[in-house]
């Protein structure tokens, strides 16, 4: 009989725990978020002020404050925030202490196209507007920049981004109407003619070899132009 009562007591305690857990979970889901915390990932300067994110949330404030956690559409909030032209991704989630957390990844510019109007090209190769909050110190692009050749420019920018030497020293790109590319570097007054992107890796190798040799011989200031268009050679014009 005692064994039977202990068995009944064990079942009762288990059911009580399940009930209390379900009751607590139900009450928690029935609550609205206690706080909203906005976090910008990384240490980069902000292209979008936190107040701009607040404005987007204010547009949804009544929804956020009135809707309980169990029906809060986090994906819809993510979509609203991610739609901002300076934001690449946004992750919205509920924290264990009852708050709403927003993690934001900003778009990252690779270069600034100097035109009217000027704009950035981001790491995805997409046009990105300038920011009123911060002006990025990035490589400048001049010349005939169009929707049809922005992919060519992006490929050149990524080649620079992925090369330790060019990432430090390259300052300007120029593209003409025939999509021929030229480049300028930080400590050289001469123009570097790259041409098209055929054999680009080899052209970069050739230029770095030329640069090191000319620098060693103190000849960098003597050149007006360096042409990388020719196969397996660098032509320097003084």
Where are these regions (language model features)?
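Structured, soluble extracytoplasmic/luminal domains of envelope-associated proteins
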Residues: 77-126, 225-227
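Extracytoplasmic segments of membrane-associated envelope/inner-membrane machinery
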Residues: 103-177
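Short beta-strands and strand-coil junctions in structured, solvent-facing domains, enriched
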Residues: 88-89, 99, 109-111, 128, ...
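Periplasmic/extracytosolic POTRA-like scaffold domains at the N-termini of outer-membrane
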Residues: 42-85, 132-154, 205, 212-216
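N-terminal membrane-targeting segments
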Residues: 1-68
């Amino acid at each position: 009989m005692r064994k039977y009562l202990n068995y009944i007591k064990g079942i009762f305690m288990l059911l009580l725990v399940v009930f209390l857990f379900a009751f607590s979970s139900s009450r928690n889901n029935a609550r609205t978020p206690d706080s909203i915390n906005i976090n910008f990932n990384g240490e980069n300067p902000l292209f979008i002020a936190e107040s701009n994110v607040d404005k987007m949330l204010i547009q949804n404030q009544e929804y956020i404050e009135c809707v309980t956690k169990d029906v809060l559409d986090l994906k819809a909030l993510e979509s609203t925030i991610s739609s901002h032209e300076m934001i690449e991704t946004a992750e919205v989630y509920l924290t264990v202490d009852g708050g709403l957390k927003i993690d934001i990844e900003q778009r990252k510019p690779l270069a600034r196209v100097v035109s009217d109007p000027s704009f950035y090209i981001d790491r995805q190769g997409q046009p990105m507007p300038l920011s009123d909050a911060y002006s990025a110190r990035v490589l400048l692009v001049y010349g005939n920049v169009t929707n049809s050749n922005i992919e060519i420019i992006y490929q050149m920018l990524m080649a620079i981004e992925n090369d330790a030497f060019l990432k430090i020293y390259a300052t300007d790109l120029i593209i003409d109407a025939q999509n021929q590319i030229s480049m300028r570097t930080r400590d050289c007054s001469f123009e570097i003619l790259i041409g098209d992107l055929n054999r680009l890796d080899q052209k970069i190798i050739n230029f770095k070899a030329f640069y090191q040799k000319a620098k060693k011989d103190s000849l960098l200031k003597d050149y007006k132009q360096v042409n990388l268009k020719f196969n397996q050679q660098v032509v320097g014009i003084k």
